[in-house]
UniProtKB/Swiss-Prot annotation:
GO terms for molecular function: amidase activity. It catalyses: a monocarboxylic acid amide + H2O = a monocarboxylate + NH4(+). Keywords: Hydrolase. Belongs to the carbon-nitrogen hydrolase superfamily. Aliphatic amidase family. Its EC number is 3.5.1.4. Residues 13-260 form the CN hydrolase domain. This is Aliphatic amidase. Catalyzes the hydrolysis of short-chain aliphatic amides to their corresponding organic acids with release of ammonia. NCBIfam families: PRK13286.1 (NF009802). CDD domains: aliphatic_amidase (cd07565). Gene3D superfamilies: Carbon-nitrogen hydrolase. It is an enzyme of class 3 (hydrolase). InterPro entries: Aliph_Amidase/BUP (IPR050345), Aliphatic_amidase (IPR023719), C-N_Hydrolase (IPR003010), C-N_Hydrolase_sf (IPR036526).
Amino acid sequence: MRHGDISSSKDCVGVAVVNYKMPRLHTRAEVLDNARKIADMIVGMKQGLPGMDLVIFPEYSTHGIMYDAKEMYDTASTIPGDETEIFADACRRAKTWGVFSLTGEQHEDHPNKAPYNTLILMNDKGEIVQKYRKIMPWCPVEGWYPGDCTYVSEGPKGLKISLIICDDGNYPEIWRDCTMRGAELVVRCQGYMYPSKDQQVIVSKAMAWMNNTYVAVANATGFDGVYSYFGHSAIIGFDGRTLGECGEEDYGIQYAELSVSQIRDFRKNAQSQNHLFKLLHRGYTGKINSGEGDQGVAECPYEFYRTWITSPDAAKEQVEAITRKTVGTAECPIEGIPNEETPSGHR
């Protein structure tokens, strides 16, 4: 894994992340104009970064945040659709892969159900290789319909890629799911705002280390009239060290080369910090010394996870016992979110 050049190689995937300024849009026409702006940026970036194999844009970079519910439903996209065709043309022209945000994607029961918050991974032929729907919408603010699974897809030069979105990344389970299924690069597209800059920078580095994976973060910048976004798009090595990181500048770009062979060699040959292998071979040294074979222990030792899988309702009761039973709290009420002093109901 390398940083500082504009090249790539047969072994190294050139990855760029963009500090895209959060747009404030209201109509479908404005969304499509912004998609064309993103497309033009891709073509220009490839001229400056000839090694670029993959370009990544933040959550909300295509639509912005529609704070008006009617606008959110009216501008929700289909996949494939007009926006994806604009991106497909750009990927073909620039001969690069791309990750793009669609907020939202129409629900199958549109407009009776809330849209999804969706990312797509597109190849250099303009084909959609992965479509991921955000599993953990940023409640209580985000009103997206939740997705229900992660994916792993083969990306440029065979690098295996998973997509996650913003608040997803605050839950260690999603990182483990992606990497245990084979992901070598976890792409975290986010529209993260202050105050949690320090926490979000730390968590992506920590998850890279804990899961022996490359991480690419693309975040928004600017002020959209409601939130201020902190940028700091970054590319992180599988050892948890940052290869390149933007500041807070609008349209800042970072670029690094991710070796396919290095991460595979590490996962095969690393020992004391091979967190993926060791999780399913717990205590193998002690087992060897005890005459109990050389495989360690594979059984899950964590009671909460066993309960969650076998009895989700019991796990929910367990967490409510140490937190609260209602989705909202009366001490800081939010309109449309039921709390212990208000009746249930949807927005």
